[in-house]
Amino acid sequence: RVDFIISEESEMLYFLNDYSEGAHEKVLQHLIDTNMEQLSGYGTDHYCETAKKKIKKACGCEDAEVFLLTGGTQTNQIVIDTLLQPYEGVVAAQTGHVSTHEAGAIEFTGHKVLELPQKDGKICAADLQKLVERFYGDENHEHMVFPGMVYISHPTEYGTLYSRKELEELSAVCREYKMPL
């Protein structure tokens, strides 16, 4: 857990999830200011369109499709299920969000969560490499859950961040085995 000090009086905000803290005053004021606007639903209003354009621009991909979803679990479930084949699973830290906090949402889609040991909430490239080598080294691997992608929480559930080097090392293993990270 990481505490973020926001004043000299040591008042702290705890970023445990997206619903444990209140909203910033400016956010609340904007909600008040726009409360009586009549908007179309399902992400087709001008606020959503503006957000989508900003995301495309930030990604440098103006022709991308952007879908706005309501929460992290739903987003993880949809992305993981979309990226994986039916026989593939997602590799994650034992403490990773998809391993512990999604109440089985990922496995509900039919994809197993393949857990790796963690240190401070992070997985390391060497452990990932061993898992994949062990999988492909097994003569019966075609009857097992394939490691199809790697999920990391950034920051982790411990509040730690992956270094650039750690991310590059994980990415190298993922690229070698053609697994999305």
Annotate each language-model stretch with its function.
Residues E11-L31:
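Polybasic, low-complexity association/targeting segments
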